[in-house]
Structures are given as structure tokens and as C-alpha cells.
């Protein structure tokens, strides 16, 4: 806070220049009007010094209106003008001058305070503190404080001193709070000084020791570098020797040692040396690498030759494989050579060719007996008590069975031998599985052609179906056995499958040839006569074939494919029917159509009776039944036409069906009204028809049964009789209704009476009730 100095108000207030108080500087213009407005609002309740001095002459600003202010202003101006004119205004001017001087000085001070860059909150706090202090003092103290004389100046200086002492007291209290900390800091200062002295001494010693240790470290570093370099050279030489050279003992093992684990370990090391020499070839001088490679290659090739020679020698003598140690060594040789296919394939081919030759020679001796074409003795692998397989003209089935059994035993022995060679009896060893299959197939391939030729020779000369089927069953059985033993891709398995096709084709050929012979043979054509019975050849044909088919338990005959099975069924069922129909159609013995239908029906009935027990022919049974049903319908129609002709109703039956065919579902008499226009449709004609009906039907059943005596199936006979009489009675009933409508005529016998005469009243009654 700025205080008004005493010197400001010490001068005398007279009319002269020396007696007048010095005028203050004009008030500062506040740059921001809004701030002055705000301060005026804040200080609205503050009492100005002028107001304090002139309490009697002024009023609060909030009680004076604007009009009153204007009036007061003009009134004062009028009074001042009068006083000047009368000369009485001198004293008032002096007082106004003093008051104006005080106000001007105070305004200057306030402007300086208010124009300071203080925030509103700070100013508010300052005035609040002043207000609190003024509230504690007496009213006269505030008046003395703002007094412009010596008293005011002294009051303000005292007030300023009080504020300063209070400020010093507050600052002293704050400093007293930091006094313990200052003491601690002084104690720390003493300790730090001691530490600094120790630090200086220590640094001096360290600097001296550092110079000495630097020299020592340099000497140690030189020694370590020399040691490391010497060790590196030593390690390089040792590593080079281990990586690129063989010692004398290892060379001895490869050149002259036994083939064992040590040999193969040393050989693997020699191969690694050979591979690692590629690094030496990248040097500026590759001569060292070339020399090492040449030497290692020489030793490796010599070792491989020893392995190949040992393997061929061991495989050439099968008895040597009884030694487990030799077999283990052979197994190691195979493991090593399996990555060198040229050597391995050469060994496998040599072994396969030698074993194939032995098997073929042994097979020929077994088939041909002790006789040898080349004059050579028996093989050492064949025992002296072995039984040769002789070809028997009377028992080809046994020969084929023995032949296949021998080949199967040979294949099993060879497969087990080769498996034991490559796996050493360990069934879980699958490393050489494909090789075992390949070698076994190559060895047994030599037997494929001889066995195929022998079996084809027997099958091609055999004419009995039963024998061929037995041979087929044997071949199929051994196909399963070979497949289980050798897999599905073996050459022997393919050969056996071809033999199955040969047997199937031969059976097809024999049946086809037999049917062709029957078709073209005159005796079979002449076998047809008026007794209308099936020919003997069909009985003989099925007596050979059906027992064979009946024994089959597979889904198809002879395990044929669905297409081939359908062809075979057509061959044994449809082809005989076709041949028989051709014979009947070209035979002039049968003059009546009814006889042709009956003999065909009897033939189909025989085939049906033969094929029903055979489950594989169930589809053909249905097909034959359909053929019989068609023939039955034709015979039924013939019998119906015969009855209509006997009764004189045949023409009327045709006329009515021309108008609208009869139907069990719908019948309306009015539909048949056009029949009246027909000339044959007269009452006299139906009188004659009625007489014929009465004359024919008492014996109609007996006559029809006699005409169907040659039909073998009683079921078909009953079906023909019932259906023909049923159709006639239905026609008879409907015709009687038409006659009643358009001729006023009815038959003597009703439809039920006719049905009773022929014994179908029950069936007819049920049919009427359904309708």
C-alpha cells in the first residue's frame, strides 16, 4: 500500500503561489473502462474522504437521482457566481482549494494503486485486511490516518511501521520453523567436508595405482593373446585331423577288418570326411582338399566293394543265413546300400534271378517228375522224398489244386525267407517293407507264366461244367490266399485273377455253345409234339447248370460283376426261352394258337419250377412269372372268345366294345343306346342266344377243363377258368341290362345262376359287393 507523505500537505494554503499547496499531477487515465466500472461497483460501499469531511452536505449516491444531481450542480454554480460578485467568496475558495488539493492527491494515489497489475482477488484481499484493521480501531484513528496535516502523516507512518513489524514478526515465525533443519544441514556440512578430504586422498592413491595396473594389464593382455593364438592353432590342427583324416587303425578296419558295427561306423566317418572336403576346395590352393578326397574315395569304394561281395555271397548261400551274426551283418549291409540304389538294385536283381531260376527248375521237376530235360540232377533244395505232381486225365481238379497248393507253399516260403532276411524276424520293422514286396514279386514272377499255361491248358480242354466250376472255386480260393499273403499288387495275384477270368469265360463259352447246338440241332426241333410237354433238352440243360448255381453263396454268380452277372442270367434263362420260342414258331405241327400258348406256358412253368429254389435267380423268377401271366391272359381271352362263339354272343361282344369297352369302374346303360341301330340287335336273335346259353353252360365247365388238360400248372388252369367265366358272366349281366332297356328282353338265367353253374358264385358275389 502506498502512503501519502507528510510533505504533500505541509505548504500553507494562501492566495499566493507560495502559500498554495502544490498541485498533483493529473489523474491517470485507466485504459480499461470495464475495470474501473468493476472497481466502482466493488467500492460502492466505501466511504470516500470527501464524504467523510462533508457528511452534512452530501447524500448517498443511491438516494440521489440524476435530476437532483443536475439541479444541485446548477444551484452551486449560481451561489458561486453570487459570491464572486459580492466579494464574499474568498474564504470559500480557499477551503475549496484545500479540499480540491486533498482530493487530487488522494486520486493520484488511488489511481496508482488501482492501475497496478494486481488481480481482483489480490486487491479484494488487501482492502479486506485494511477494512478488518479499521474495524478494530476507533473512528478517530481512521480520521487521523487520512488527515492531510502532520497528524495524518505521523499516523500513516505509525500505521506503516505496525504493518512492517507485523510482517517481520510473521517472517521470523516462518524462519524459526526452518531453524532445526539449518542445524542439521550444518552438521552434514562438517561430515561432507571430511568426506571430501578422504575423497581427495583416495583419488590420489587410485591414480597412482591406475598407472601401475595399466602397465601390468598390457603385459597380461599380450601374454593372453599369445596363449589364445597358440591354443587356436592347436585346436585347428586337432579339429582338422579329426575331421579330414583317418588314423591307421581306421584305415585297417576299412581295408581288412570284419564287417561289423565298427566297420560301418568307420565307413560313415570316411563319408563325412569326403563331404566335408568341399570346404577345402573353396580355398585358394585346393590341392590339399583334392588329395584328401581322392584318398577317402578310394577307401570308400573299396569298402563298398567288400559290402557288395559279402552280400552276394551270403544271399547265394541260403544256409549261411542260419547264423544270426551273419544275418545281422547282412541286415546292416542292406541298410547301408538302400541309399545307393545302383549297388542295391544290382544285388536285388542278381538275387531275384538266381532264386527265380531255382524256383522254375523246381516247379518243372515237380510237374514232370524225376525226368529232366537237361539231364541235371535234383536241386539240393528239393528233398529226396518230395512228391511230384502228375497230370491225371481223370482228375484235373486235383491236379489244379495240387499245382496251386505247391505254388502257394513256395510263395509263402519265399515271402517268409525274404522277410526274415530284411527284418531279422522283427515284424514291427517296416523299413524294407516296399523292398520286400518288390523282391518277392520279382522272384515269384518267374512262376506266373508256367502256372498260367498249365491251368489254361486244363481249362481249355475241359467240357464239364461241374469240373470247371470246381476249378474256378479252387482258383478263387487261392486268389484270396495269395492276396492275403502277397498283397493285391503281386504278379502271382494278377496271374491268378487272369485264371479266374479264363474259367469264367470258359463256362460262358460252354453254355453258349450248348445253346447254339440245341438251337441248330434237328433232333431238338423234332422233340416238339402234340402232347405239348417241354422238350427233354431243357431238363438236361438245367440239370447241369442249376445245381452249380444253387451251390454259389456269393452275391453274384461266379463273383461276376453286375453287368456280367446279368449276361449270365440271360444266358441260362432268357436264351433257352428264346431258342424254344423259335423252335415252336417254326414248327408246323401246331396248327392252333391255343396249343402254341399251352406248350410255351408249360415250358415257362418248367423253368419257373427249376429256378424258384435258387435265390440268385429271384429276379428271373419274377420275369418268368410275368411271361406266364401274359400267356395266361392270351389263353383266357381265347377261352372267352370260344364261349362267346358257342353262345352266339361273339358279334355282340365286339359291337358293344366298339361303342364303349366294358369297365368294372363305370357302367351306364344309356351309353350303349346306339346299339339299336345295328341290324343284328333284334329280339329274335337274343331268343336264339338264350337257347344256346341254356344248352352250353351245363357242360361248359367240363368242356373247358378237357381243353386245358395238357396245361401242366393247375394254378394256371384254375386262373384261366375263373377269369374267363368271370369275364363272361360280367358281360352277360351287363348285356342283359342293355336288353331290358332297349329290347324289353331278359335272359332266362340270371348272371348269378350262370356263375353257379360254372362254380364261381362266391368269387362273383364278392366282386359284386365290391362294385
Curated annotation (Swiss-Prot):
It is a peripheral membrane protein. It is found in: Golgi apparatus membrane. Pfam families: COG6_C, COG6_N. One of its GO terms (cellular component) is Golgi transport complex. The keyword Transmembrane helix does not apply. One of its GO terms (biological process) is protein transport. Keywords: Golgi apparatus, Membrane, Protein transport, Transport. InterPro entries: COG6, COG6_C, COG6_N. Acts as a component of the peripheral membrane COG complex that is involved in intra-Golgi protein trafficking. COG is located at the cis-Golgi, and regulates tethering of retrograde intra-Golgi vesicles and possibly a number of other membrane trafficking events. Belongs to the COG6 family. This is Conserved oligomeric Golgi complex subunit 6. It comes from Candida albicans (strain SC5314 / ATCC MYA-2876) (Yeast). The gene is COG6.
Amino acid at each position: 500500500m502506498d502512503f501519502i507523505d507528510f510533505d504533500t500537505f505541509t505548504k500553507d494554503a494562501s492566495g499566493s503561489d507560495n502559500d498554495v499547496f502544490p498541485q498533483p499531477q493529473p489523474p491517470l487515465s485507466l485504459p480499461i473502462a470495464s475495470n474501473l466500472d468493476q472497481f466502482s461497483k466493488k467500492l460502492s460501499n466505501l466511504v470516500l474522504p470527501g464524504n467523510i469531511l462533508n457528511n452534512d452536505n452530501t447524500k448517498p449516491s443511491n438516494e440521489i437521482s440524476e435530476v437532483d444531481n443536475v439541479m444541485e450542480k446548477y444551484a452551486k454554480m449560481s451561489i458561486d457566481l453570487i459570491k464572486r460578485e459580492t466579494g464574499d467568496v474568498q474564504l470559500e475558495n480557499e477551503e475549496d482549494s484545500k479540499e480540491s488539493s486533498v482530493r487530487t492527491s488522494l486520486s493520484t494515489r488511488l489511481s496508482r494503486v488501482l492501475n497496478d497489475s494486481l488481480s481482483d482477488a489480490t486487491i479484494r484481499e488487501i482492502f479486506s485486511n485494511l477494512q478488518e484493521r479499521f474495524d478494530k480501531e476507533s473512528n478517530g484513528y481512521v480520521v487521523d490516518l487520512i488527515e492531510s496535516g502532520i497528524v495524518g502523516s505521523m499516523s500513516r507512518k505509525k500505521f506503516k511501521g505496525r504493518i512492517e513489524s507485523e510482517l517481520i514478526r510473521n517472517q521470523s515465525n516462518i524462519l524459526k520453523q526452518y531453524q532445526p533443519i539449518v542445524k542439521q544441514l550444518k552438521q552434514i556440512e562438517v561430515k561432507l567436508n571430511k568426506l571430501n578430504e578422504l575423497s581427495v586422498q583416495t583419488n590420489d592413491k587410485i591414480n597412482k595405482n591406475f598407472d601401475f595396473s595399466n602397465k601390468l594389464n598390457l603385459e597380461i593382455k599380450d601374454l593372453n593373446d599369445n596363449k589364445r593364438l597358440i591354443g587356436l592353432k592347436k585346436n585347428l590342427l586337432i579339429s582338422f585331423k579329426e575331421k579330414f583324416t583317418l588314423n591307421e587303425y581306421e584305415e585297417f578296419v576299412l581295408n581288412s577288418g570284419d564287417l561289423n558295427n565298427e566297420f560301418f561306423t568307420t565307413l560313415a566317418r570316411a563319408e563325412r570326411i569326403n563331404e566335408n572336403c568341399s570346404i577345402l576346395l573353396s580355398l585358394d590352393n585346393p590341392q590339399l582338399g583334392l588329395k584328401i578326397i581322392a584318398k577317402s574315395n578310394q577307401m570308400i569304394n573299396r569298402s563298398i566293394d567288400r559290402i557288395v561281395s559279402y552280400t552276394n555271397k551270403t544271399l547265394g548261400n541260403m544256409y549261411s543265413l542260419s547264423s544270426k551274426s551273419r544275418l545281422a551283418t547282412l541286415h546292416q549291409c542292406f541298410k547301408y546300400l538302400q541309399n545307393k540304389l545302383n549297388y542295391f538294385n544290382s544285388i536285388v536283381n542278381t538275387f531275384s534271378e538266381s532264386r527265380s531260376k531255382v524256383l522254375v527248375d523246381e516247379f518243372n521237376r515237380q510237374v514232370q517228375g524225376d525226368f529232366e530235360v537237361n539231364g541235371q540232377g535234383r536241386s539240393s533244395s528239393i528233398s529226396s522224398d518230395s512228391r511230384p505232381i502228375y497230370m491225371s486225365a481223370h482228375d484235373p481238379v486235383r491236379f489244379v489244386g495240387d499245382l496251386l497248393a505247391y505254388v502257394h507253399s513256395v510263395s509263402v516260403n519265399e515271402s517268409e525267407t525274404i522277410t526274415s532276411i530284411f527284418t531279422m524276424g522283427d515284424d514291427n520293422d517296416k523299413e524294407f517293407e516296399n523292398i520286400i514286396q518288390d523282391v518277392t514279386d520279382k522272384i515269384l514272377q518267374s512262376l506266373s507264366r508256367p502256372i498260367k499255361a498249365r491251368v489254361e491248358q486244363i481249362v481249355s480242354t475241359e467240357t464239364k461244367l461241374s469240373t470247371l466250376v470246381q476249378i474256378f472255386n479252387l482258383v478263387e480260393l487261392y486268389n484270396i490266399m495269395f492276396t492275403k499273403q502277397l498283397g493285391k499288387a503281386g504278379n502271382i495275384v494278377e496271374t491268378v485273377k487272369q485264371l479266374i477270368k479264363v474259367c469264367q469265360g470258359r463256362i460262358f463259352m460252354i453254355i453258349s455253345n450248348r445253346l447254339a447246338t440245341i438251337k441248330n440241332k434237328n433232333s431238338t426241333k423234332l422233340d416238339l409234339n402234340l402232347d405239348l410237354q417241354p422238350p427233354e433238352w431243357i431238363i438236361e440243360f438245367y440239370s447241369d447248370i442249376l445245381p452249380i448255381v444253387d451251390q454259389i453263396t456269393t452275391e453274384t454268380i461266379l463273383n461276376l460283376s453286375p453287368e456280367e452277372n446279368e449276361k449270365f442270367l440271360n444266358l441260362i434263362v432268357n436264351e433257352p426261352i428264346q431258342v424254344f420260342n423259335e423252335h415252336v414258331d417254326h414248327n408246323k405241327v401246331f396248327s392252333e394258337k391255343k396249343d402254341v400258348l399251352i406248350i410255351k406256358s408249360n415250358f415257362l412253368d418248367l423253368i419257373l419250377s427249376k429256378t424258384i429254389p435258387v435265390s440268385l435267380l429271384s429276379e428271373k423268377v419274377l420275369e418268368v412269372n410275368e411271361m406266364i401271366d401274359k400267356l395266361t391272359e392270351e389263353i383266357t381271352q381265347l377261352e372267352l372268345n370260344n364261349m362267346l362263339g358257342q353262345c352266339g354272343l361273339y358279334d355282340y361282344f365286339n359291337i358293344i366294345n366298339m361303342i364303349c369297352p366294358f369297365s368294372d369302374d363305370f357302367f351306364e346303360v344309356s351309353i350303349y343306346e346306339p346299339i339299336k341301330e345295328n341290324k343284328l340287335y333284334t329280339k329274335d336273335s337274343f331268343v336264339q342266344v338264350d337257347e344256346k346259353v341254356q344248352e352250353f353252360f351245363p357242360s361248359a365247365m367240363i368242356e373247358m377243363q378237357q381243353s386245358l388238360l395238357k396245361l401242366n400248372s393247375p394254378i394256371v388252369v384254375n386262373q384261366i377258368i375263373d377269369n374267363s367265366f368271370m369275364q363272361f358272366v360280367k358281360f352277360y349281366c351287363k348285356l342283359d341290362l342293355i336288353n331290358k332297356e332297349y329290347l324289353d328282353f331278359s335272359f332266362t338265367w340270371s348272371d348269378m345262376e350262370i356263375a353257379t353253374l360254372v362254380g364261381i358264385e362266391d368269387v362273383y358275389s364278392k366282386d359284386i359287393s365290391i362294385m
